[in-house]
């Protein structure tokens, strides 16, 4: 099959202008505020390539000739590099416009609220639409001399969520939920050995913890209490104990933080790298089910990142996975 692409810039299809000039297209998809990116390397051999407007919006589609192309996302141009010889223009764009007010350093606090409400408040002052289905109660949370990007990322990590800004929407979603931002069920994608060009699977017991401890302070008395969460999936050889130094405002927040930290350790228990012919149905936070590889390897993993590369050599996709919430003990 012949790979194909389409690029629309500020509403104008520029595919024909780029057909014989596009040297390389790279798309990176990761869970996180500043991760999703597009890089275009364009041949400017005759000096006729005009510099795109910084802030221009690029919409990218990938697929194969004779089939409907898949929309891969919309990106805002924020970096231009022209180098030579041979003359070449490199355009970098982000799924979230990272040039806006989200990087402003702020301080503030919330009491007696929910994670969803905090996200809505942050979104409102930056002009972002917000999707956060979690009504987790928050006794108190403070933003101290940090940007909204950093603050939301920190909150998401504490509650075992991902935070992503894309196309003007802030999405804060539970990790490995199996659902899209709209609540649509996303089934694990099954990959067999024949689907993959190359693979690399690593199990690492050093990241497994038997116990995670967090602390919280009782209102009024100020007495400090602790929460201990054991890992039921930890092998007998895992004896490590992680103690979170942060002091939480309530028992509920301390318990949630312990669960999130334990899930993070579990995800680090395995890493998988797969290289395969280009396909657009692979994306960060989708569960992947490996079948027909090897006993002890087959099973479910969670996609950490996806990198698509399109060039004259074809379209390839590289997938990085982790061990998921349960881990690979």
Residue ranges of each PLM-predicted region?
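Conserved "cap/hinge" positions at secondary-structure junctions
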Residues: 62-64, 174, 286, 292
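Extracytoplasmic/secreted envelope proteins and their assembly/folding machinery
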Residues: 74, 116-119, 149-153, 211, ...
């Amino acid at each position: 099959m012949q790979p194909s692409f389409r690029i629309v810039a500020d509403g104008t299809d520029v595919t024909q202008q780029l057909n014989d000039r596009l040297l390389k297209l790279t798309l990176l998809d990761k869970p996180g505020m500043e991760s999703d990116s597009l890089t275009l390397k364009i041949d400017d051999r005759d000096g006729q390539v005009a510099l795109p407007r910084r802030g221009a919006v690029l919409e990218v589609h990938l697929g194969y000739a004779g089939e409907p192309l898949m929309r891969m996302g919309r990106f805002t141009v924020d970096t231009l590099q022209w180098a030579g010889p041979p003359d070449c223009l490199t355009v970098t764009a982000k799924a979230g416009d990272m040039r806006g007010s989200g990087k402003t350093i702020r301080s503030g606090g919330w009491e007696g609220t929910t994670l969803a409400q905090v996200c809505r408040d942050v979104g409102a002052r930056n002009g972002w639409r917000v999707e956060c289905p979690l009504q987790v109660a928050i006794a108190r949370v403070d933003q101290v001399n940090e940007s909204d990007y950093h603050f939301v990322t920190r909150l998401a990590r504490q509650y075992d969520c991902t935070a992503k800004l894309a196309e003007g929407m802030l999405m804060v979603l539970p990790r490995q939920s199996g659902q899209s931002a709209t609540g649509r069920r996303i089934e694990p994608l099954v990959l067999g050995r024949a689907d993959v060009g190359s693979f690399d699977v690593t199990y690492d017991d050093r990241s497994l913890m038997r116990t995670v401890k967090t602390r919280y302070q009782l209102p009024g008395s100020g007495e400090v209490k602790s929460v201990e969460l054991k890992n039921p999936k930890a092998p007998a050889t895992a004896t490590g104990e992680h103690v979170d130094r942060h002091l939480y405002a309530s028992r509920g927040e301390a318990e949630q933080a312990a669960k999130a930290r334990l899930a993070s350790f579990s995800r680090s228990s395995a890493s998988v790298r797969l290289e395969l012919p280009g396909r657009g149905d692979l994306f960060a936070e989708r569960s992947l089910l490996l079948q027909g590889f090897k006993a002890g390897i087959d099973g479910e993993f969670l996609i950490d990142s996806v990198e698509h590369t399109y060039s004259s050599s074809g379209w390839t996709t590289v997938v990085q996975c982790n061990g998921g919430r349960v881990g690979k003990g």
